[in-house]
């Protein structure tokens, strides 16, 4: 068949390697399953975060509420990834062939969605660690600027993955420079958090730092993966990596912050939080004597 445009232009037009690779039915089903589990988990946890906010001291309730917003936003984006995945392939014989027609699969929606979710996730940190207000605003902005630059340079670069690897790598490096800047800003918040956490809870910000590095670090791996080959396994493994990263950096991260804040609320004298944590028979008796 004669292409109306050069192969390079055609390769760029399909955007992501998902549109270049024929999948076995097992790989296609795995892709659907990974995306379905991801959006299902995000939507379900809206409820968890809204309910859990009620156990916290009022000044901390905004933190799980922000997690609920992130869950809704990411859930919608991942639902869209799922439906696009379903539309992008057609069954030919026993294989799922990308149609490269009007409905092509794209990971670019993810990057668009991060523009919203990442600044929210970062702003949760100084609020949860009770950094006082003018400093909190300053730190939120100082983290969000490199974060958005990291995402947009990565968004531009990822279109190179279908063949233009120098575009993928050059913009990948530029994006990584912003990531390093972001990591430095996050470290500043963690250091402040260690300094003002109650002594019993000081391990939480310390451990969260390593958790942050390990989970946010999965995204550049997913970005670089297409260079290992255009195969069905790479396509599926990449979606799996994105999903593990999504569930870790948004959902589990939100649970960690909420559990930290439950303890902190209790230590700061908020009785419903203390009761929620209390497991001893005496504690239960005291709680019931209070009549609630
Ligand atoms: C990109 C491009 C390649 C280089 C680097 C990247 C980093 C991406 C990160 C994304 C984090 C996203 C989160 C989303 C939650 O909703 C852009 C892939 C370093 C760290 C936490």
Describe each model-derived feature in a short phrase.
Residues 41, 63-87, 213-227:
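Hydrophobic alpha-helical transmembrane segments of multi-pass membrane proteins
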Residues 184-188, 207-292:
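C-terminal transmembrane-bundle signature of multipass membrane proteins
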């Amino acid at each position: 068949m004669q292409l109306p445009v050069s192969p390079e232009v055609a390769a760029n037009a399909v955007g992501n390697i998902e549109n270049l690779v024929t999948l076995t039915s097992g790989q296609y089903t795995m892709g659907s399953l990974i995306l379905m589990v991801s959006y299902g988990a995000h939507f379900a946890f809206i409820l968890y975060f809204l309910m859990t906010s009620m156990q916290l001291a009022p000044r901390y309730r905004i933190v799980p509420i922000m997690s609920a917003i992130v869950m809704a936003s990411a859930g919608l984006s991942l639902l869209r990834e799922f439906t696009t995945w379903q539309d992008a392939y057609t069954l030919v014989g026993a294989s799922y062939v990308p149609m490269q027609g009007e409905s092509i699969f794209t990971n670019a929606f993810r990057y668009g969605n991060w523009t919203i979710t990442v600044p929210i996730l970062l702003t949760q940190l100084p609020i949860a660690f009770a950094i006082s207000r003018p400093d909190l605003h300053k730190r939120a902005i100082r983290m969000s600027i490199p974060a958005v630059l990291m995402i947009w340079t990565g968004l531009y670069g990822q279109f190179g993955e279908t063949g233009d690897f120098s575009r993928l790598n050059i913009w990948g490096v530029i994006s990584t420079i912003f990531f390093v800047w972001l990591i430095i800003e996050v470290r500043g918040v963690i250091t402040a958090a260690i300094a003002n956490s109650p002594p019993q809870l000081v391990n939480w910000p310390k451990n969260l730092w390593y958790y942050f590095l390990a989970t946010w670090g999965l995204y550049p791996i997913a970005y670089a993966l297409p260079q290992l080959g255009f195969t069905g396994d790479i396509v599926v493994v990449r979606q799996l990596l994105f999903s593990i990263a999504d569930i870790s950096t948004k959902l589990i991260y939100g649970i960690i912050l909420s559990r930290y804040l439950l303890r902190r609320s209790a230590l700061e004298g908020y009785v419903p939080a203390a009761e929620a944590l209390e497991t001893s028979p005496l504690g239960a008796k005291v709680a019931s004597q209070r009549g609630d």
